[in-house]
């Protein structure tokens, strides 16, 4: 019932008004993210739910959230993988800038990231710090380009998140030859860590991106064993519509109904 409510709220907020030359496709969704109590409460609730489940999956040595996790992983140190944009960091201020300038992504994206002004989504920082306090290593698998990796790290530090320098916590697109497919980066983490949870706002944050092209039944099958798959759905409904609008929402509704059925 919770996800149905979230879905309804987003349909309400992104329903188009009468077209005129001043309309901007990002306007309603950006306003929703920046000012809605429902958005705040849902994001907070999603991360709070993950925090409540963390100790259970930490104690269960046979649990892994990653399809890439093979072999004897039970005694590996624990880790969590998170996407960055609109999963951990809120870029609605950048979206608002696009609206003001009557522009579109990727115009100004790198410059925005280098300003290091993004805020954490509600609940994200508290969850990450809680996981760190339990000895869980944090990895950000992102399609931000390597050019802005240091800015991303600095942005985190300004917001109070400290990451040790002994491992590479931010695995960026373009680093070590990585393209936008995140599979090889998840495999890299899985070599040395047991992956407890994964967070993202796109199916490619969890499975090989080419699996997005599979049949609806296959997509359901490959996601059955994903821990905290509800976090994926919730963050999709909250944030992806801000970036991609009504067409993507229709896709997400279909995926939501497939999984529920």
For each predicted feature, which ranges?
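Sec-dependent N-terminal signal peptides
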Residues: 4-12
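Non-catalytic pre-domain segments flanking phosphatase-related domains
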Residues: 16-82, 251-261
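Second-shell loop/turn segments in exported
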Residues: 32-41, 110-117, 139-145, 174-175
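C-terminal cap/substrate-recognition subdomain and adjoining C-terminal extension
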Residues: 48, 149-261
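Surface-exposed patches in mature extracellular/periplasmic domains of secreted proteins
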Residues: 58-70, 138-143, 165-168
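Active-site neighborhood of HAD-like aspartate-dependent phosphohydrolases
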Residues: 77, 88-119, 133
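Structural recognition of the beta-strand scaffold that forms the well-ordered cores
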Residues: 79-83, 89, 137-142, 169-172, ...
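Substrate-recognition element of Asp-dependent hydrolases with the DxDx(T/V) motif
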Residues: 86, 124-157, 201-203
């Amino acid at each position: 019932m919770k996800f149905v409510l979230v879905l309804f709220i987003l349909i309400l907020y992104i329903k188009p008004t009468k077209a005129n030359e001043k309309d901007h496709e990002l306007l309603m969704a950006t306003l929703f993210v920046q000012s809605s109590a429902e958005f705040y409460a849902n994001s907070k609730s999603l991360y709070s739910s993950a925090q409540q489940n963390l100790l259970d999956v930490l104690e269960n040595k046979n649990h892994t959230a990653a399809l890439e996790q093979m072999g004897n992983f039970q005694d590996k140190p624990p880790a969590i993988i998170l996407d960055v944009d609109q999963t951990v960091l809120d870029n609605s201020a950048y979206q608002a800038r696009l609206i003001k300038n009557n522009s579109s992504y990727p115009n100004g994206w790198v410059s925005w990231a280098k300003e290091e002004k993004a805020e954490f989504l509600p609940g994200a920082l508290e969850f990450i710090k809680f996981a760190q306090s339990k000895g869980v290593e944090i990895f950000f698998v992102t399609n931000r380009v390597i050019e802005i990796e240091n800015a991303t790290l600095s942005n985190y530090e300004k917001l109070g998140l400290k990451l040790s320098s002994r491992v590479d916590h931010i695995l960026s697109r373009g680093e070590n030859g990585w393209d936008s497919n995140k599979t090889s980066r998840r495999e890299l983490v899985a070599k040395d860590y047991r992956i407890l949870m994964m967070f993202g706002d796109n199916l490619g944050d969890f499975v090989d991106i080419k699996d997005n092209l599979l049949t609806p039944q296959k997509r359901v099958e490959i996601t059955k064993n994903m821990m905290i798959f509800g976090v994926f759905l919730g963050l999709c409904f909250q944030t992806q519509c801000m970036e991609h609008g009504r067409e993507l929402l229709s896709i997400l509704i279909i995926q939501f109904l497939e999984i529920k059925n």
